[in-house]
Curated annotation (Swiss-Prot):
Family recorded in the similarity comment: Belongs to the TrpF family.
Listed CDD domains: PRAI
EC code: 5.3.1.24
PANTHER family assigned: N-(5'-PHOSPHORIBOSYL)ANTHRANILATE ISOMERASE
GO molecular function, one term: phosphoribosylanthranilate isomerase activity
Protein's UniProt keywords contain Isomerase: yes
NCBIfam families in alphabetical order: PRK01222.1-4
Keywords of this entry: Amino-acid biosynthesis, Aromatic amino acid biosynthesis, Isomerase, Tryptophan biosynthesis
Pathway: Amino-acid biosynthesis; L-tryptophan biosynthesis; L-tryptophan from chorismate: step 3/5
The protein, known as: N-(5'-phosphoribosyl)anthranilate isomerase
Amino acid sequence: MVRVKICGITNLEDALFSVESGADAVGFVFYSKSKRYVSPEKAREISLNLPPFVFRVGVFVNESLESVLDIAFHAGLNAVQLHGDESVEFCERLNEKIMVIKAVGISEEQDVRRALEYRKFPVLLDTKVSGYGGSGKVFNWSVVLPYRDQFRYLILSGGLNPRNVERAIEMVRPFAVDVSSGVEISPGKKDHNLVREFIKKAKGL
């Protein structure tokens, strides 16, 4: 069964609803320029109130190794998701302390080949945009297909929503899917009906 991560969590209500609806993971964005930014203290508060066995992931962009680790341990994270220009070497050093998920922006086949450089880690494929962060737009999933089996753990993101997630899973066969804006009322506030529907369709329930 495909795993589901609900990202851009900013409040306990949305986090608990996501988990109760079947989400395997929740994501906190620690990139200060994001509309979904949450402070490490707020993330810690939410994290401490979640049930056991829920995966807590923090999103970072070009932070120092020390800063990532400080926030990760303070907020009670299980993994960090790196959306910047972090090198393979940086990821390896960080991975000695906490699980690393490397996000790579995709618009064409050469981007997928670049993502393969990180395949020793779980790799999240997102839609390529100028700057950093999500776009809420879908990329051409077909560019992934020739390389799909070279990724050990492939996480699909970028413009997913309850209307397209079944098709995305059927086509790409990811280990997990990641959604944020596709289940929102406004940035940082989830639409609970959409969250429930997304998880149900992603897991084939």
